[in-house]
C-alpha cells in the first residue's frame, strides 16, 4: 500500500518536471528561427522559476488542522452531543456551522474544523481553506500554498504560449521553405507543437478560472456549495409567502483587488515572485496568517444573520426533523 501511495505521488510530480525538461531540450534542438542567445535565456528562466514554484507548492503544503493542537477533539461523542466545546476564540470568529447549529467537527481527524476547512479523503487530512485536490502534484491546494499554485498556473500559461509561438514559427518556416518536398517534419518539433497547443489552451482556461476565483475570494468547494445552497433556497421559496434571499460569498470583501491581496500579497513583488505573503494590518490579530480565521464582508454577514430566523421558521414548517435546522451561513 505504501508503495502504491508513493508511486501515486511521485508519478505526477516526475511527469510534470519531465515535461518541462523535455520541452527545454526540444527547444534547444529544434528551434532555429530565432537566435538561441535571444530565446534560450528567456525560456530557461521562465521554466526554472515555474519548477521552483512547483517545488515550493509541494513543500509548503496547504496547511492542516493537525498543525494546531488547539483544534484537537478529545471525545468525538461529547463533541457531537455538545458536551465538548470548541475553543472560544474559534467560535467567536467563525461563520460556518453544521445544519443543526453545532460547530463543525471531523471524525476522521478528531479535530474542530475552522471556516473554509474541509477533509480531503485522498490526503486523509483536514485542509485549511481547502480549494481542491490537484492530481498534477498529488496534493491539496489550501491556505498556505494557494498563492504558489496561482503563480505556477500563470508561469505555465506564459511558458506554454511562448513555446507554442516558437514551435509554430519553426513549422511555418519549414512549410514556407517547402522542405516538406525533400524531408519529413521533425518528429520532436511536431510533438513539441502539439503538446504546447493542448497545454496552452487547457491551462489558460483553468488559469483564468482560478484567478477569477481568487478575485472573488472564493474556493472551488465554496463555489459548488453556494450553488447547491441557493438551489435549496429556491426550492424552499416555492412553499413560502416570505421568500428567502439567496446568499453570496461572505468572504468576498467587495473589491477584486482586496480579494486578490488576501491571497497573493500586497505588493507587485509578492504577486510576481514565489515568496511568502507578508501579513498586513488587516489581518485579525495575526490569526489570518494561520488560516484559522478570515476577514468577512460585514454587509453580507449582517444580511445573512437577519434572514436566519425566517429561514429557520420556514424549514420547521416544512418538516419537524431537527436535522434540517439551519444556523447562520451553513452553505459551506
UniProtKB/Swiss-Prot annotation:
The protein's Enzyme Commission number: 2.3.1.225
PROSITE patterns xref list:
DHHC (PS50216)
Q: Which UniProt keywords apply?
A: Acyltransferase, Lipoprotein, Membrane, Palmitate, Transferase, Transmembrane, Transmembrane helix, Vacuole
Question: What's the PTM story here?
Answer: Autopalmitoylated.
Provide the catalytic activity annotation: L-cysteinyl-[protein] + hexadecanoyl-CoA = S-hexadecanoyl-L-cysteinyl-[protein] + CoA
Q: Which residues lie on this side of the membrane: Lumenal?
A: 35-37, 169-188
Listed under GO cellular component are: vacuolar membrane
Transmembrane portions of the chain: 14-34, 38-58, 148-168, 189-209
Q: Name one GO molecular function term.
A: protein-cysteine S-palmitoyltransferase activity
Ranges facing Cytoplasmic side:
1-13, 59-147, 210-332
Q: Which Pfam families match?
A: DHHC
* Localization annotation: Vacuole membrane
> Which part of the chain is the DHHC domain?
104-154
Record's bilayer topology term: Multi-pass membrane protein
What family is this? Belongs to the DHHC palmitoyltransferase family. PFA3 subfamily.
**The protein's name in its UniProt record:** Palmitoyltransferase PFA3
Q: From which organism does this entry originate?
A: Candida glabrata (strain ATCC 2001 / BCRC 20586 / JCM 3761 / NBRC 0622 / NRRL Y-65 / CBS 138)
Q: Which gene specifies this protein's sequence? A: PFA3
Amino acid at each position: 500500500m505504501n508503495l502504491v501511495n508513493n508511486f501515486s505521488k511521485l508519478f505526477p510530480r516526475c511527469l510534470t518536471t519531465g515535461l518541462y525538461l523535455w520541452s527545454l531540450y526540444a527547444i534547444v534542438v529544434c528551434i532555429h528561427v530565432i537566435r538561441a542567445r535571444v530565446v534560450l535565456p528567456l525560456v530557461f528562466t521562465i521554466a526554472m522559476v515555474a519548477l521552483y514554484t512547483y517545488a515550493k507548492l509541494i513543500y509548503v503544503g496547504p496547511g492542516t488542522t493537525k498543525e494546531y493542537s488547539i483544534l484537537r477533539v478529545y471525545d468525538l461523542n461529547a463533541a457531537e452531543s455538545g458536551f465538548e466545546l470548541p475553543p472560544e476564540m474559534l467560535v467567536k470568529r467563525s461563520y460556518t456551522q453544521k445544519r443543526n447549529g453545532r460547530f463543525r467537527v471531523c471524525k476522521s481527524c478528531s479535530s474542530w474544523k475552522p471556516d473554509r476547512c474541509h477533509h480531503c479523503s485522498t490526503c486523509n487530512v483536514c485542509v485549511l481553506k481547502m480549494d481542491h485536490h490537484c492530481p498534477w502534484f498529488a496534493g491539496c491546494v489550501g491556505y498556505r500554498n494557494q498563492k504558489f499554485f496561482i503563480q505556477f498556473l500563470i508561469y505555465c500559461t506564459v511558458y506554454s504560449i511562448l513555446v507554442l509561438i516558437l514551435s509554430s514559427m519553426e513549422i511555418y518556416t519549414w512549410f514556407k521553405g517547402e522542405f516538406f518536398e525533400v524531408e519529413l517534419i521533425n518528429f520532436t518539433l511536431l510533438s513539441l507543437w502539439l503538446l504546447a497547443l493542448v497545454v496552452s489552451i487547457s491551462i489558460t482556461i483553468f488559469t483564468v478560472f482560478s484567478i477569477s476565483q481568487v478575485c472573488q475570494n472564493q474556493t472551488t468547494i465554496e463555489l459548488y456549495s453556494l450553488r447547491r445552497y441557493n438551489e435549496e433556497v429556491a426550492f424552499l421559496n416555492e412553499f413560502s409567502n416570505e421568500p428567502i434571499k439567496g446568499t453570496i460569498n461572505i468572504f468576498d470583501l467587495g473589491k477584486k483587488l482586496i480579494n486578490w491581496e488576501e491571497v497573493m500579497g500586497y505588493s507587485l513583488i509578492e504577486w510576481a515572485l514565489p515568496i511568502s505573503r507578508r501579513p498586513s494590518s488587516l489581518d485579525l490579530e495575526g490569526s489570518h496568517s494561520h488560516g484559522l480565521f478570515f476577514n468577512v464582508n460585514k454587509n453580507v454577514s449582517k444580511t445573512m444573520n437577519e434572514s436566519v430566523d425566517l429561514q429557520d421558521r420556514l424549514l420547521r414548517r416544512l418538516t419537524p426533523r431537527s436535522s434540517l435546522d439551519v444556523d447562520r451561513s451553513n452553505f459551506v
